Every structure is written in structure tokens, then in C-alpha cells.
């Protein structure tokens, strides 16, 4: 039963991808795994959109970078210090360079839809790792322009964009903090 733990230990954030395009079947497999996630009232409120069109990926990158640039220009205080320390930038080349973008949506009217979608994303990330694929959960400051680009139905809300491909990112996974467990009370 150690296999799941090993996958979780191995999985890391990937922002750089090889140009080689993974088989679509590996993404479909990963989405089937995500579909097995628990959901509030068994609503299964997730919807997935695979984007592989180069022009559309470029448009998504442009609208995301525009909202990121505005965000970075206006951020202040401790958050700005943290972003600078980590060398984060408004540029998001992985949105164009990844062979695929997986857009994950929630049904607005479903009970506990956001919480449920993020459970599915956790399953999805582990399934991608199992297939040797990397990703980073990316949440732009403003999803509305992306929703327009992909003709999102009004009953859905974009929750996260996952660039997906074979990792070409040599940096190691950051160490995990020790698990701290309390019993009954804090």
C-alpha cells in the first residue's frame, strides 16, 4: 500500500515542459481517476476541458499575463516581499509551452462544488504523476477572460488551469513540513 505515498512524495510542481506531446490516452486516464473523487452529495460537479490548440493556448497565456501584470503592479506589503523572495513573476510561459492545458470547472449550483472540484484535482495530480506527467495548479487573478475564450457555459465556473506535459524542470521538490497531529483538542 506504499505506492500512493510514493507517488505523493515524488510529485512536484512543474513549470517547464519538454516539447514531446504525451499520448492523449494518459490525460484521459488521469481524468477518469479524477472522476472517482468524492464529492458533496455525490454531485460530481467537475467538468474538464483539454486545450491543445496552439493559438488558443497563446490567447489564454496573454489574458492571464495581462491580469497577472496588473496584480503584480498593485500588490504590496508582505505578499510582495514573499513574491519577490520566491522570484515569482507575472510572466507565465508554461501556459503556452505545455503540450496541454487542462481547464477544470465547477458547476456553480452544485452543493460544495468548489471543495469537491479540488478533491478531484488532487486525484488528477497523482494520476498525472503516475503517468510520468507534470503540472502546476495555476489560478490567475481573473478567470473571466479565459472563460470567455473557451465559451464557458454560464452554469460553470473555471477553478484552475493545469498545464500538462513531460517535466523538463530540474529543480528538486521542496521539503515537506513534519506532519503535526493532535488528538481530540488543540
UniProtKB/Swiss-Prot annotation:
Effect of residue 41 to F: Increases affinity to Tyr and decreases affinity to I-Tyr
EC number: 1.21.1.1
Pfam families for the chain: Nitroreductase (PF00881)
Keyword NADP: yes
BP-aspect Gene Ontology terms: tyrosine metabolic process
Catalytic reaction(s) noted: 2 iodide + L-tyrosine + 2 NADP(+) = 3,5-diiodo-L-tyrosine + 2 NADPH + H(+); iodide + L-tyrosine + NADP(+) = 3-iodo-L-tyrosine + NADPH; 3-iodo-L-tyrosine + iodide + NADP(+) = 3,5-diiodo-L-tyrosine + NADPH + H(+); L-tyrosine + chloride + NADP(+) = 3-chloro-L-tyrosine + NADPH
Residues that coordinate or bind 3-iodo-L-tyrosine: 41, 68, 72, 92
EC supergroup of this enzyme: oxidoreductase
Cofactor (UniProt): FMN
Residues at which L-tyrosine binds: 41, 68, 72, 92
GO molecular function: FMN binding; iodotyrosine deiodinase activity; L-tyrosine binding
Keywords: Flavoprotein, FMN, NADP, Oxidoreductase
Annotated binding of FMN, by residue: 11-15, 38-39, 176
Physiological role: Catalyzes the dehalogenation of halotyrosines such as 3-bromo-L-tyrosine, 3-chloro-L-tyrosine, 3-iodo-L-tyrosine and 3,5-diiodo-L-tyrosine. Activity towards 2-iodophenol is weak.
Record family assignment: Belongs to the nitroreductase family.
Subunit structure: Homodimer.
Protein name in UniProt: Iodotyrosine deiodinase
Lineage of producing organism: Bacteria, Thermotogati, Thermotogota, Thermotogae, Thermotogales
Amino acid at each position: 500500500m506504499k505506492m500512493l505515498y510514493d507517488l505523493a512524495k515524488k510529485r512536484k510542481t512543474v513549470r517547464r515542459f519538454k516539447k514531446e506531446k504525451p499520448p492523449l490516452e494518459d490525460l484521459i486516464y488521469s481524468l477518469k481517476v479524477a472522476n472517482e473523487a468524492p464529492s458533496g452529495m455525490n454531485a460530481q460537479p467537475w467538468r474538464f476541458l483539454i486545450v491543445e490548440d496552439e493559438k488558443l493556448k497563446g490567447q489564454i497565456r496573454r489574458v492571464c499575463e495581462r491580469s497577472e501584470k496588473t496584480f503584480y503592479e498593485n500588490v504590496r506589503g508582505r505578499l510582495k516581499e514573499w513574491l519577490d523572495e520566491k522570484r515569482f513573476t507575472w510572466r507565465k510561459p508554461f501556459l503556452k509551452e505545455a503540450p496541454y492545458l487542462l481547464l477544470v470547472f465547477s458547476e456553480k449550483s452544485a452543493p460544495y462544488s468548489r471543495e469537491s472540484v479540488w478533491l478531484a484535482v488532487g486525484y488528477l495530480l497523482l494520476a498525472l504523476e503516475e503517468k510520468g506527467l507534470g503540472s502546476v495548479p495555476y489560478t490567475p487573478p481573473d478567470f473571466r477572460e479565459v472563460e470567455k475564450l473557451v465559451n464557458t457555459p454560464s452554469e460553470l465556473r473555471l477553478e484552475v488551469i493545469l498545464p500538462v506535459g513531460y517535466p523538463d524542470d530540474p529543480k528538486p521538490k521542496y521539503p515537506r513540513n513534519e506532519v503535526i497531529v493532535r488528538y481530540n483538542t488543540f
